[in-house]
Amino acid sequence: MGTLEKKLDNLVNTILLKAENQHELLFGACQSDVKLTNTQEHILMLLSQQRLTNTDLAKALNISQAAVTKAIKSLVKQDMLAGTKDTVDARVTYFELTELAKPIASEHTHHHDETLNVYNRLLQKFSAKELEIVDKFVTVFAEELEG
């Protein structure tokens, strides 16, 4: 195995370790004293942007509805979410952030923005020609991951 392959292997493994048991890799340290899972924080962020149901959240996060239900129950218990029934179909519940949850959702959004800023700073170090190669590599790598 060549040096570049080893570097790539180390990078992928480092990313996996940093994102272990999370559904994303974010830059920036958490400022909140509230202990939530990454999934719970992501749910708060998504709900701060639009009204969603359990099913909508599961699709957006690419996780099971059971996992969303578990996360939501915990957030409701911690007074971070309030459920409201749909006026047309009472079987459908929408969740809204409480005042307690809004700063946490905002911070999670900030971490997403900061992560994109880090990527942008990294990409600015490359020429247009090099960026074409990076883009091609990322595309091919993603295709390999999908199998």
Swiss-Prot record:
The lineage of its organism: Bacteria, Bacillati, Bacillota, Bacilli, Lactobacillales. It comes from the Bacteria. This is Transcriptional regulator AdcR. Keywords: DNA-binding, Metal-binding, Transcription, Transcription regulation, Zinc. Homodimer. Zn(2+) 2 binds at residues 30, 41, 107. InterPro entries: AdcR-like, ArsR-like_HTH, HTH_MarR-typ, Metal_resp_HTH_trans_reg, WH-like_DNA-bd_sf, WH_DNA-bd_sf. It holds the Pfam family MarR. Zinc acts as a coregulator and is required for DNA-binding activity. Residues 1-143 form the HTH marR-type domain. GO terms for molecular function: DNA binding; DNA-binding transcription factor activity; zinc ion binding. Residues 54-77 bind DNA. Zn(2+) 1 binds at residues 24, 42, 108, 112. Gene3D superfamilies: 6.10.140.1680, 6.10.250.2360, Winged helix-like DNA-binding domain superfamily/Winged helix DNA-binding domain. SUPFAM superfamilies: Winged helix' DNA-binding domain. SMART domains: HTH_MARR (SM00347). Zinc-responsive regulator. The gene is adcR.
